[in-house]
């Protein structure tokens, strides 16, 4: 379908329909009128023509099935362009007759609720998976955020402790090494107390 859309991108829709299905102009005009009514409705709802067509293609009921068949015929013709056009005419002649019936069956008032209903159906079908995935992603992301925050806070606390305690300990060790043990020895009367005092006297004050 994308290939067909790309090939026919530059052409107006009326020409696309006539060329792809190979119908006479009278039949094409009836179909174009039916399509223009359908295309105006999605535009009124603020949708582009492409979205309107895609939703119309997937629509349940007679019209959706017929359009799917028409799309298959288009694909078959685009793949094998050597086929004569007479093969596609019987199905294409039946198509415009059934389209007015479908248009009569559902007036413009019914069109909008069906679309809305189909949207909600799509939403309910897709929403459990999507919502679960979204919840899992959100949950994972929140867990990751908590872990990262926890890791960052722990790292900051450890850095603070190291800066406060570690730096202070190193300062104490530097201070304690020359002075404290000797002073303690001298005070306690442990052997070598005199040596410590001698060493203190021998060391020049800087």
UniProtKB/Swiss-Prot annotation:
Compartment annotation: Nucleus
Acidic residues composition-biased segments: 27-42, 57-70
Keywords associated with the record: Nucleus, Transcription, Transcription regulation
Classification via Pfam families: BEX (PF04538)
Matches recorded under InterPro entries: TF_A-like/BEX
Top-level lineage group: Eukaryota
Compositionally biased intervals (Basic and acidic residues): 1-26, 43-56, 71-86, 102-113, 121-160, 196-206
Span list, region Disordered: 1-206
Gene Ontology CC terms, in alphabetical order: nucleus
Broad class of the protein's primary localization: nucleus
Similarity comment: Belongs to the TFS-II family. TFA subfamily.
Summary of the function given for this chain in its UniProt record: May be involved in transcriptional regulation.
Protein name: Transcription elongation factor A protein-like 5
Lineage: Eukaryota, Metazoa, Chordata, Craniata, Vertebrata
